[in-house]
Amino acid sequence: GVDGMTVDEFLDYLRAHAVEIVDTVKAGKYKPQPVRRVMIPKEEKGKFRPLGIPTAVDRVIQQAIAQKLSDEYEPVFSLHSHGFRPCRSCRTAIDEALDIANQGYVWVVDLDLSKFFDTVNHSKLLQLLSDKLKDGRVVSLIHKILRAPIQEGDKITPCEIGTPQGGPVSPVLANIMLNELDHELERR
């Protein structure tokens, strides 16, 4: 992240500031730092995937939120959703596809939501979260995480759309956003 903190430095920092961090989060006063933009080359020549790398403290907070969200949402996620889920993987998706094919189904729908993480609508996502989560402080903190500025070199830009790939909370937020689509596809 933009803090440049190593794991050892972070452990020392955490020992000295853990109570303060927890109190700030509980009070609703925590403000995430900018995420560091890193461009990762895609397989297609000349194409890049933007990652947003949070600071060490922000990463730990995001991981805690991701665990809470996973506990809340896992029971309502589609049984046929395999991405970014506990005990699920490409292997389990392939196994399920083989089972379905062996049942005689011959049609496949292949969806690729181009630049999905980069285009997540904050308002829609926050509404979905507000509908399910009882603690408004969690929704407010997620809103702050989504709005954390992006730092690329010396340039800092506001974030008004998307959830940066690279943070621990982004995959579960993506699954929450896509859950309605998953269930709609099941009905068809």
Which residues are covered by each model-predicted region?
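Residues forming anionic-ligand binding surfaces in small-molecule and nucleic-acid pockets
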Residues: P41-K47, L69, D154-P158
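Hydrophobic alpha-helical hairpins/lids featuring a short glycine-rich hinge
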Residues: L51-L69, P75
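Surface-exposed loop/turn segments and immediately adjacent short secondary-structure elements
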Residues: V2-A27
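Ordered, soluble secondary-structure elements with a strong preference for glycine-centered loop motifs
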Residues: G1, L51-R59, T119, P171
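Conserved polymerase palm-domain catalytic core
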Residues: H17, T24-P34, V38-M39, V76-H80, ...
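Short small-residue beta-strand/loop micro-motif enriched in glycine and branched aliphatics
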Residues: G46-L51, E74-F77, V108
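Charged boundary/loop elements
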Residues: V2-T6, Q67-H80
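Conserved beta-strand/loop block within the catalytic cores
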Residues: P32-P54, D58-R59
